[in-house]
Swiss-Prot record:
One Gene Ontology CC term in the entry: membrane
Keyword Membrane: yes
Localisation: Host membrane
Gene source species: Acidianus two-tailed virus (ATV)
Topological category with respect to the lipid bilayer: Multi-pass membrane protein
Chief place where the protein resides: host cell
UniProt key word Transmembrane: yes
Protein name in UniProt: Putative transmembrane protein ORF545
Disulphide bridges: none
Amino acid sequence: MLRHRNCLCEKTFKLVRLTSSRQRVLSFGFLTISPSNSLMEPKKSFNFLVFVVALSYIFSLYQVLALTPEGIILYALLFLLNFVFAFVVNDTAIAIKYLFVLMAMRAINLIYSLPLDEDAIRMFAGYRLLHGVNPYLPMPTVFNHYDVPIGLRTLTEYGGFVERLIYPGLSVFAGVAEYALGYVIFNVVIYVTFILISYVFLRNKSTEALIFAVLWLLFGGVNLATLLLTVGILLRKYNGFFVGLAISYNQLYTLIAPFLVIYYLAEGKKEVLRQVAYALFGFLITNVPFMVWDFKLWFSAMLYSVSQPIVPIGFSISRETYMGFFPIPFKVYEYLFITMYIASIVIYAIMFKIVAKWAYVFPAISMIAYPRTLLGYITSWLPPAFFFFFTRTEGNVKVAKLKPLGTAVLIAIMIMPIFVPALTSTDVNTPFTFKVTKVYVGTYGNVYKMSINATVYSPTVKNITFVVIPDFYPFYNTYLWWSTVNVTVGQNYFNITPLAPSQEIGFNNATYTVVGVYGPYYYFVTLVLVSNGTMFSNFTYTPKE
């Protein structure tokens, strides 16, 4: 059966076929198969392709669990149709089209949902720049000022995330556009532009881009950095310049640099110097204005962010650690990530000739310590860098052609859903508000209970988790106090206590942050406890212009 599927896949995809008197090579998206490459024999390669596609489905479906039942049913239906056509009917071409439908629906959810924390940071930077204020501030200060333009923030902000990621220059300028035009409009423009560029690449360079684009969008959507790297793919001689621009948009792209240097060393030292110079130029042109404005402030922000690893809060055991289920310090995840990442670079450098075609695998290995990063950022830098920069086919490439009708259907499937309502976002991300009405302090000044008054606006909110973060020890939180059940629309009153009856959060005369979590979002309340057990709640800070 597997042998039959391999033959069928080879006939159906017809992505890139190279013929010579001695060898025949078939390239699937990011896998190159040839008789001379024992690591990429057809059976293993096809199974790996199926595994990656299935993994993308799992991640994509997992992300919609906070959506409405209608949205979950829609995603499940698309997944079922794709599975049937791919593995039951054995019509891979139709399966690809349904894959694009699923990708498009995923993009709808991204476009019409509220911004991520990184987007909110950029919008705040754009807000300050539009008002003539230097946008470069330490991250804790940024979120003390946080009052624009949305009130929702994600779990990644506590535990160290926002204190360790500052916005580079291009991100600031993008934030101006996002704030002035609105995030939704800006994201739609990016999405459409990416589709057009991908289509040009698809028709004129290699139809490998078909599977690549699907997986790219299924995992993490499209942002400005992915567009920049796509342009860099089209203009390969200037890869470094566009990588530099991508780093100026999101510093996570610095993870590419060591692998790129090793890769270009194979082409000679001059090529390394040329690409590094391009990257520096691309990074500096958007950062020079802020360097001139206040170099010390800009430099301290850049140095602070790159010297502090990002804490991996997300859809993983690290999230449960953050929520208080596992008493594991966040430093464990940081050290694990750093160790695996460095090991990947060393292995790649030592075994370059053997593993050059598999370079994209190594960052994924290091992301085991960062499941949320793997989910959210894998397509921001991994596929464009390690598919197009490393897994290159050899010889004369004959580009497969799409029939006119198939091309029209493909474009319609990809673009049309942008202009319809967000079917999977109905009644999602509706905020709830809460305040702490009383804090209970024991005989010895220990806090053992809090009373919460929460107002819920959406019937889809079924569960709220309250987390208490002591400001005096914010990076090792073991205080998940209570998770609610059967939440109703309107007023809800809760008494939250530690998970363990003997556990107490801390002591009197200290400052705490209470986080009310539902789905991936929360509102925050800052508490100031005083000796008699009273407190100030709902603390806000208006940004100064």
